[in-house]
Amino acid sequence: MTAAALAPARPEGFFEALAPQGRRVLFALAAIAVCMLFAFPVLWLVLTSLRPGTGVYYVHRGTEFTIDNFGEVLAQEIVVRALLNSFLISTLATALSLGVTATSGYMLSRFRGPLPNAWFSLIYIFRCVPYVAWVLPLYFVTQRLGIFDTYWGLLLPHVAVHVCFFSWIMKGFFDGIDPSMEYAAMIDGCSRWGAFLRVALPAAVPGLTALAILCWLYTWNEFLFALILTAQNTPILAVVMAQFVHELGMEWHLMSATAVLALGPALIVTIFGQKYVIRGLKV
């Protein structure tokens, strides 16, 4: 008899012992459990936004639902202003960030020399700095420049954060584009800038679309910069929700209604932009 025949059989693991159908059922149950884990807070938020104020605290009134909370929230001018400001700042920050990030990523991908190396090192250093450590210096800078509690006071920090992070991703997108197409365009008379605009940039559209969605969602959900760099002139929705916490308690029903209003645009962008994000990140 051979040594292989005399060797003891290797015990099967738990997943190997299961039949293929049993493994599929097990994975399906695990997926359902994970989905429920993430969906439960959202469901609770929506249900709380539809309950009257007393229904949040008393179980016997928990089955009463109303949409009056949304009317009460939208009747407050500061909430409407915050909703519009959040949308405007998210859109403008995304547009500015894409313009700077595209050129930054292209430079890091195509050029070598002191300037690209210095820019790469600067981005790397800023990415090593903890996010919270930026807040206090930015507060003093915006105060000195006179842009505290203005659109620019929020836009510039967001653009700086996006450029430092997404330049790395854009570099990867441009690294995946064959530079010979740009060289062919330059032989036909295009300048380097023309080759970038007419050849490299259109080829990077899937990546730019993915970054645009990520930038918009990040800015829409951002809280810390909005809390420190704004006051009354530029209310942001993430900060306005905190006004329902006061010395008399927490107005959970109104806070939840405002949170659902904030969740709506982000959910729409995520649902319709999911395939673009996946496609862009696969480039």
Show the residue positions of the predicted features.
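A hydrophobic, multi-pass inner-membrane permease signature
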Residues: 2-283
